[in-house]
From Swiss-Prot:
Matches recorded under NCBIfam families: rRNA maturation RNase YbeY
Broad class of where this protein is predominantly found: cytoplasm
InterPro entries: MetalPrtase_cat_dom_sf_prd, YbeY, YbeY_CS
Gene3D superfamilies, sorted: Metalloproteases ('zincins'), catalytic domain (3.40.390.30)
Subcellular location: Cytoplasm
Official protein name in the record: Endoribonuclease YbeY
Example of a GO cellular component annotation carried by this entry: cytoplasm
PROSITE patterns, sorted: UPF0054
Biological process (GO), any one: rRNA processing
HAMAP family, A to Z: Endoribonucl_YbeY
E.C. code: 3.1.-.-
Cofactor: Zn(2+)
Residues that coordinate or bind Zn(2+): H102, H106, H112
Amino acid sequence: MIRILGEGKGSKLLENLKEKLEEIVKKEIGDVHVNVILVSEDEIKELNQQFRGQDLPTDVLTFPLMEEDVYGEIYVCPLIVEENAREFNNTFEKELLEVVIHGILHLAGYDHEFEDRNSKEMFEKQKKYVEEVWGEWRSNPSEDSDPGKR
C-alpha cells in the first residue's frame, strides 16, 4: 500500500497513479506499506545534509525503515522535480513518475551510487516501469488530469 503525504503540485497525479505504483511495490518488494512524502526545497535540503552530507536540495530521497507498519519512505521535492523536468526536456508529470519509481527501486535494494553491478538493471527496470505506467495513464487519463490540478 502507498500513502501519499503532503500537498501541492503532483499530489493528485500520484493519487491517480497510486494503484499502478502499488503494483510495482508489490512486484519488487512485496505486500508492504510505503509513504511517498511531498516536501519543500528546504525540507529536502535539510534531509540531504543530515543523511547524505550534501548541503543542497535534491529531487528524491529514499529511506528504508523496514518497520512493521511502514517499510520505507520516499521524499520528493516537486520544485526540484519541476526544475529537472525542464532541464531534461520532460514533462513534470513524467519526471515525477520517474523519481517515485526510482525511490521504489531503491527500497527494493537497487543501488546506482555504490554498486555498478545492479545500476544497469535498476535503470532498465525504471525505464520499463515508467513507460508502462505513463503509456497506460496517457491513454486513459482520469477526470483529474488537468495539469493545473496535479
